[in-house]
């Protein structure tokens, strides 16, 4: 019987759960990943629950930047100790697509103890995808930090960046509503 390391076992799970129709659709629509198994997010969340926190495996998966599912699973396995602003910024600098950016913010960045610093660093980036992540992050806090959300959204709307335009407009609208209510 063959023994597999953790990374190989996870990849075998991806393969067993693959969805060729979804994978082909993603490829045709410009997904930047060379390898796409076509798993949906609930399937990836189930795998993460089975594995539990595992920083070493999370780093291996994140380094596997040619595989979509590896990039989606990695943030789910990270322990709180790994969620430093410096480490998360290093990871953010390697993100190139919205799906991974959304998942990264939801599964890792929001759990960081240094959200304010990350908001400042991501929001001040020259890379549109990092500013997109900052908007996603501030949007999750718009009720409690509407002034900052409004400032960030207005600044991003001034840039007129296609990637962030609609999200910035949503953040602005919600921040204005909360500002009126308070």
Named regions from a protein language model:
Residues 1-182:
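Alpha-helical scaffold domains
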């Amino acid at each position: 019987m063959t023994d597999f390391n953790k990374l190989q076992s996870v990849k075998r799970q991806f393969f067993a759960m693959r969805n060729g129709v979804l994978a082909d659709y993603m490829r045709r629509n410009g997904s930047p990943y060379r390898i796409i198994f076509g798993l949906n997010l609930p399937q990836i969340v189930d795998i993460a629950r089975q594995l539990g926190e595992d920083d070493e495996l999370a780093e291996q998966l994140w380094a596997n930047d040619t595989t979509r599912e590896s990039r989606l699973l990695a943030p789910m396995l990270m322990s709180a100790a790994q969620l430093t602003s410096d480490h998360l910024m290093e990871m953010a600098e390697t993100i190139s697509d919205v799906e991974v950016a959304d998942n990264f913010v939801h599964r890792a960045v929001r759990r960081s103890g240094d959200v304010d610093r990350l908001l400042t660093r991501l929001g001040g980036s020259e890379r549109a995808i990092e500013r997109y992540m900052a908007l996603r992050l501030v949007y999750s806090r718009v009720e409690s930090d509407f002034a900052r959300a409004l400032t960030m959204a207005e600044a991003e709307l001034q840039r007129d960046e296609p990637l962030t335009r609609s999200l910035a407009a949503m953040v602005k609208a919600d921040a204005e509503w909360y500002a009126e209510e308070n």
